[in-house]
From Swiss-Prot:
Top-level taxonomy: Bacteria, Pseudomonadati, Thermodesulfobacteriota, Desulfovibrionia, Desulfovibrionales
One Gene Ontology MF term: glutaminase activity
Assigned protein family: Belongs to the glutaminase family.
Catalytic activity annotation: L-glutamine + H2O = L-glutamate + NH4(+)
EC assignment: 3.5.1.2
Gene: glsA
Binding site for substrate: 66, 117, 161, 168, 192, 244, 262
Identification of the protein by name: Glutaminase
Enzyme class: hydrolase
Length: 310
């Protein structure tokens, strides 16, 4: 691995070159996200040894959104193991948008992937809990253990999401009717919406990825958060479905597991070595941060990390 000074230099270059790149627009179907300043941008690296390099608005707290699916998948794996997740949710790409109903219809109403909305709600329903609040607190605790104890829900964002999540409610009932929902469907939808409504900064997001890169050990706190054997399962899902409809393009061009969120976050992982996180609100047509993709890809390429290059 390069020295941290080299990594910082590459991070600085990524920010300088792409933090003002044009194109894209904030997500406008969630009022909270529509109002975030679109000129914000940040990029950060956290290594498997806990070293940090960052540039830009790296302390700005933004919505985790779909990147939360990684954390809930991790918890479901801890609770039940890979085989149960594969059987009860699925572990294959859908080839369709992240909120697709057609993807369910085409596959017997099975969600297929924990990293699309249907699969993420199924994951939330699978988490061991005796009540709605216990389910929510366990998911929030997993986000904090992977990233930082400072990660917390935004009541404003949650309210904004809960009043616009009619499509997800419909998906939850479809899953319930097919036997792929493991608690009350509206409870699962509520908790899923909350998990997407937490705020974190770019360094904390990179720490989430670095914990997975480091075989489940948080390199900042030293806690063994996940069983080492679960981390490859998480990264495999990120490779197949993590970047929405652009997952194949990301694997082709960058060659690393990735996950995006409509809050503007991008996370990519170099197994065993580091994680790269980026943030900027304007999104492309499939919901990925325009600048975030450019910054994260630049860092990975400049440091020479691509799983498919010998």
């Amino acid at each position: 691995m390069p020295a941290i000074e080299k990594i910082q230099s590459v991070v600085n270059s990524a920010y300088a070159q792409f933090s003002k790149a044009s194109g894209g627009a904030n997500a406008d179907y969630i009022p909270f996200l529509a109002n975030i300043p679109s000129d914000l941008a940040a990029v950060a690296v956290v290594t498997a040894q806990g070293q940090v390099a960052a540039a830009g608005d790296a302390q700005y707290r933004f919505a985790i959104e779909s990147i939360s699916k990684v954390c809930t998948l991790a918890l479901a794996l801890e609770d039940f193991g890979p085989q149960a997740v594969q059987e009860k949710i699925g572990t294959s790409p859908t080839g369709l948008p992240f909120n697709s109903v057609m993807a369910l219809e085409l596959h017997g109403d099975k969600p297929l992937s924990p990293l699309v909305n249907a699969g993420a709600m199924a994951s939330a329903s699978l988490v061991k809990a005796g009540s709605t609040e216990e389910r929510w607190q366990r998911i929030l605790d997993m986000q904090r253990r992977l990233g930082s104890k400072e990660i917390a829900i935004s009541d404003e964002l949650n309210q904004s999401e809960q009043t616009t999540n009619f499509h997800n409610r419909g998906i939850a009932w479809l899953l319930y009717s097919a036997g792929y929902m493991y608690c009350d469907p509206m409870e699962a939808c509520d908790v899923y919406t909350r998990q997407c409504s937490t705020l974190l900064n770019t360094v904390e997001l990179a720490t989430v990825g670095a914990t997975i890169a480091a075989r489940g050990r948080n390199p900042v706190t030293g806690e063994q958060v996940l069983k080492p054997e679960h981390c490859p399962c998480i990264m495999a899902e990120m490779t197949m479905e993590g970047m929405y409809d652009s997952s194949g393009d990301w694997a082709y061009k960058v060659g690393l597991p990735g996950k995006s969120g409509v809050g503007g976050g991008i996370l990519t992982i170099v197994p065993g070595i580091m994680a790269i996180a980026a943030f900027s609100p304007p999104l492309d047509s499939v919901g990925n941060s325009v600048r975030g993709q450019k910054m994260a890809a630049f860092v990975a390429n400049e440091l020479g990390y691509n799983l498919y290059k010998a």
